[in-house]
Curated annotation (Swiss-Prot):
Organism expressing this protein natively: Teredinibacter turnerae (strain ATCC 39867 / T7901)
Name the record gives this protein: Cytochrome c-type biogenesis protein CcmE
Bilayer topology annotation: Single-pass type II membrane protein
Function comment: Heme chaperone required for the biogenesis of c-type cytochromes. Transiently binds heme delivered by CcmC and transfers the heme to apo-cytochromes in a process facilitated by CcmF and CcmH.
Lineage, broadest ranks: Bacteria, Pseudomonadati, Pseudomonadota, Gammaproteobacteria, Cellvibrionales
UniProt subcellular location: Cell inner membrane
Amino acid sequence: MHPKRKQRLILVLFVVLVSSVGVSLTLYALNENINLFYPPTKIVNGEAPSGRTIRAGGCVVPGTVTRAKDNLEIDFDVTDGVSELSVTYDGILPDLFAEGEAVVLTGMLDHDGVFVATKVLAKHDENYMPPEVADTVTTDGVEHMKTCKGISYDS
């Protein structure tokens, strides 16, 4: 093989190798940091991964919010109009958090099927619902308004 060709081949192989390593590292980093959104029905049906950070959302079921007296732990249920998901959160809730309102949660599903939230986001005005929640808030295949009004909370 001609020395000039050999040098060019080595350079091309080196560039391909470095590019492959770069793409692999980027995909690995993205895979570790992506939090997929799951509605309560998919989580209850076991379609969401256990032990991995995910996002969930729905409407807070009225009458299910219980606060601990000696710490910041709060337990409540979230529904998409079909299934209810039990949630526990240890921290300060957003000011707009309320029963019957939309929330998006980030956290993990524990072995008992309880969603342990590390972050709670509440809606920011009276007509807003996060797009992920709005797409999943259905009952019998019929979409409700883009808020939690009109959802039947008796699952």
